[in-house]
Regions:
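Short, low-complexity N-terminal intrinsically disordered segments enriched in polar/charged residues
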Residues: 1-30, 124-125
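Hydrophobic/aromatic beta-strand elements that line small-molecule binding cavities or substrate pockets
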Residues: 52, 64-69, 81-82, 95-101
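Short beta-strand edge/turn micro-motifs at domain boundaries
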Residues: 95, 99-122
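Polar/charged side chains located within well-ordered beta-strands of beta-rich proteins
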Residues: 78-80, 113
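Short, cysteine-centered beta-strand-loop-beta hairpins and adjacent loop/turn segments enriched
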Residues: 84-91
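A solvent-exposed, acidic/Ser-Thr-rich amphipathic alpha-helical stretch
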Residues: 21-74
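Residue-level signal for well-ordered, solvent-exposed loop/turn and beta-edge residues enriched
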Residues: 33, 90, 106-107
Length: 125
């Protein structure tokens, strides 16, 4: 059975909308890399979990609107709008370009997102 990489990405974002850190982590390979440009790169599941926990401590909600998704083999590219609600009551809508690479078992081995940090910080300040 072939791995449906686009479905895995959609399922990953569904876990984000639930703010389900354990669920999010279940999609990563042990040696995965999350390169959340312009943030520091997280290498390995413990570092990725630390970054997720750091984000979620101030979040009250998350949603994503995928504008375009392209799939080729074990790679998914997407253009999307991430909406992050903060516990402070502020909210940010951030355009993101993302790339996901998967191993043969359907686990994320590389997640690279590009976004403008200033766009995010201006909206939550």
């Amino acid at each position: 059975m072939a791995v449906d990489c686009e479905k895995i990405v959609n399922d990953l974002f569904a876990a984000w909308t639930r703010l389900d850190a354990d669920g999010i982590m279940s999609y990563f390979a042990e040696d995965a890399v999350w390169d959340n440009v312009p943030m520091p790169t997280a290498k390995g599941k413990p570092a990725i979990r630390q970054m997720i926990d750091g984000f979620m401590k101030d979040m009250s909600g998350f949603s994503v609107r995928i504008l375009k998704s392209l799939h080729d083999g074990n790679t998914v590219l997407d253009a999307r709008i991430d909406t992050i609600a903060m516990k402070s009551g502020k909210r940010a809508e951030v355009p993101v370009a993302g790339m996901f690479e998967f191993d043969a078992a359907g686990r994320i081995k590389l997640w690279r997102d590009y976004f403008d940090l200033g766009t995010f910080t201006r909206q939550i300040s």
